[in-house]
């Protein structure tokens, strides 16, 4: 790709900002639409809990294999082509998640689902970095907030359609139609370039400062994964809540995170990235400390709310930092930190379970709080 073509491809404005928001919404919508279908897949294929857990690992494997390659793909083909291709694959694959009826075919469908999600995740964040940089103001939190809103619409919408009596295939096809409409709406103003020319290898191992930012992303995604997988267990086993109510912990966390991100651009533009990164990571750590140190279910729920609100704008700031560093091309850096961060979601909950088995769940959560303090300690260096 010539420099001239490359420069012409990357001139984002208001319309590109709207298309970026649509891309984040589509990704959240597609990912969350699968969640209400999991029980149907389990019953259709005849899986027990253990075999279902192994099968679901295929999503993570697909994402981890695809994410490191996406930075180079966007450099060669542009954000637009990669986002549209991944979105199209997602639309084709979602109905297969309802139709596959053997473990082998379901594993393949889930691998493709994970790969498509991983590719669109990295590509839309590369586009977001370029668009934010061109705007001259903080926008990343708002983009990530639209992903959360898309998740709420995806999970809630499919659940509502199933509750109304539609079969799973009809419910997911309705979601796919909405995704196609939104992809077509976003199509024209997605970036045809990637901001970075690249004629090198398909994968570049992250180095130096990018590796450190990736570690901080790992910590933040680990904290998010711990809330997703362990907050309900914590509330039932250590705070005496009934299983039917224990989901409140993650629900409060997710709502606080969504609200924080939707208001995050205004907060970051007003306070600056350093104060938001420092305050957010400290808020998350304090939330966990409150949850584990006060023997009250209400205190734990308040603590989880603080974790969600505090963490809401940290990852967007880290993505901005990856886009602004000069150690690696921005597209490769974003692909690297996304991959490392995603490993936190996959490995973190298992590590928490291992620590909890050796000591207690409170100690395991305390370790997460300590890691969050390392993010706070890094705030000045990351945002300078």
UniProtKB/Swiss-Prot annotation:
The keyword DNA repair does not apply. It is a multi-pass membrane protein. Keywords: Membrane, Transmembrane, Transmembrane helix, Transport. Gene3D superfamilies: MFS general substrate transporter like domains (1.20.1250.20). CDD domains: MFS_MosC_like (cd17393). GO terms for molecular function: transmembrane transporter activity. Its main location: membrane. The keyword Transport applies. One of its GO terms (cellular component) is membrane. PROSITE patterns: MFS. Belongs to the major facilitator superfamily. This is Uncharacterized MFS-type transporter YPO1221/y2967/YP_0917. It comes from Yersinia pestis. It is found in: Membrane. The chain crosses the membrane at residues 22-42, 52-72, 81-101, 106-126, 143-163, 164-184, 202-222, 240-260, 276-296, 299-319, 327-347, 352-372.
């Amino acid at each position: 790709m010539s420099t001239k073509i490359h420069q012409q491809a990357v001139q984002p404005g208001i319309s590109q900002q709207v298309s970026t928001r649509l891309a984040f919404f589509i990704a959240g919508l597609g990912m969350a639409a699968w969640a209400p279908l999991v029980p149907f897949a389990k019953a259709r294929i005849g899986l027990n809990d253990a075999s279902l857990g192994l099968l679901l690992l295929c999503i993570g494997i697909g994402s981890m294999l695809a994410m490191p390659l996406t930075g180079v793909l966007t450099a060669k083909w542009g954000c637009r082509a990669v986002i549209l291709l991944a979105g199209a694959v997602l639309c084709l694959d979602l109905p297969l998640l309802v139709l596959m009826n053997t473990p082998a075919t379901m594993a393949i469908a889930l691998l493709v689902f994970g790969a498509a999600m991983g590719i669109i995740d990295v590509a839309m964040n590369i586009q977001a970095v370029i668009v934010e940089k061109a705007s001259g103001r903080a926008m990343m939190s708002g983009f990530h907030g639209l992903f959360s809103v898309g998740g709420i619409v995806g999970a809630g919408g499919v659940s509502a359609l199933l509750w109304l009596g539609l079969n799973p295939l009809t419910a997911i096809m309705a979601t796919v139609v909405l995704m196609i409409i939104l992809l077509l709406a976003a199509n024209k103003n997605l970036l045809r370039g990637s901001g970075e020319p690249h004629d090198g290898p398909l994968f570049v191992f992250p180095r130096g400062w990018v590796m450190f930012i990736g570690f901080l992303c790992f910590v933040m995604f680990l904290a998010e994964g711990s809330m997703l997988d362990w907050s309900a267990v914590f509330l039932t086993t250590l705070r005496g809540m009934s299983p039917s109510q224990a989901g409140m912990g993650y629900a409060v966390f997710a709502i606080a995170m969504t609200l924080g991100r939707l208001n995050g651009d205004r907060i970051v533009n007003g306070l600056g990235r350093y104060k938001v990164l420092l305050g957010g990571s400290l808020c998350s750590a304090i939330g966990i400390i409150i949850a584990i140190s006060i023997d009250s279910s209400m205190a734990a729920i308040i603590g989880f709310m603080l974790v969600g609100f505090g963490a809401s704008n940290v990852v967007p700031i880290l993505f901005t930092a990856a886009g602004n560093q000069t150690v690696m091309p921005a597209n490769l850096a974003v692909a690297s930190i996304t991959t490392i961060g995603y490993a936190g979601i996959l490995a973190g909950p298992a590590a928490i379970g291992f620590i909890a088995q050796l000591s207690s769940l409170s100690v395991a959560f305390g370790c997460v709080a300590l890691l969050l303090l390392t993010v706070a300690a890094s705030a000045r260096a990351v945002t300078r």
